Amino acid sequence: LGVSAFVLYYRMPNAHHEIPLKDAQTALLIIQKRAKEWNINKNNIGIMGFSAGGHLASTVGTHFKNKKERPAFMILGYPVVTMDKNLTHKGSRDNLLGKNPSDELVKLYSNELQVTKKTPPTFIVHTKDDGTVPIANSENLLKSLQENKVPAKLVTYDQGGHGFGMRKKGIPVENWPEELKGWMKERRLIK
């Protein structure tokens, strides 16, 4: 695809919900600072995350305070987006916010509620048979992105479950990287 990738090993919150976000924002700043050295276009640095990592990626894309903290785009795979107890992944919510979070904290980390016109363009992939993270997470995020006129694409598949990643499974979901490639070309993120 012609991309450079970095893997972030972020700290777990341990009752400090802001820690993963700070780690991800710091990583973005380091990559921007060293972009020339690494032959990277500092204006095209995006973020990608899957499942709970999708929640962190969507948090980075909706909780930035300045342009340097904002990724140029988001790629989200079967993401946990909301902290609403009826739609979230309970383990992700408990790990980030604790067992009895305040309504204010739930709202703050329900990223579909944090979308603005400044949220970066977003590509989302999810399967309808995901038994771990309900597809409503992705659908509600897409709706918020569209309401704020943020370029967004949600690609859904009937089968694939949770955690399909990029591996071949002999079912249509294995084609999602081609959908992503087309989206990235359309946005001139790759050639």
Q: Would you name each region that the model predicts?
A:
Residues 2-9, 46, 153:
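A fold-wide structural signal in alpha/beta-hydrolase
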Residues 6-42, 170-175:
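Catalytic nucleophile-loop/oxyanion-hole region of alpha/beta-hydrolase
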Residues 118, 123-126, 130:
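Short beta-strand/loop motif that positions the catalytic acidic residue
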Residues 79-114, 120:
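Mobile cap/lid helix-loop segments that gate and shape the active-site cleft of serine hydrolases
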Residues 4, 9-13, 80, 158-160:
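Short beta-to-alpha linker loops that shape the active-site pocket of alpha/beta-hydrolase fold enzymes
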Residues 83, 129-133:
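Acidic catalytic loop of the alpha/beta-hydrolase fold
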Residues 26-88, 106-107:
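Primarily recognizes the serine-hydrolase "nucleophile elbow" in alpha/beta-hydrolase
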Residues 135, 139-191:
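C-terminal catalytic histidine-bearing segment of alpha/beta-hydrolase fold enzymes
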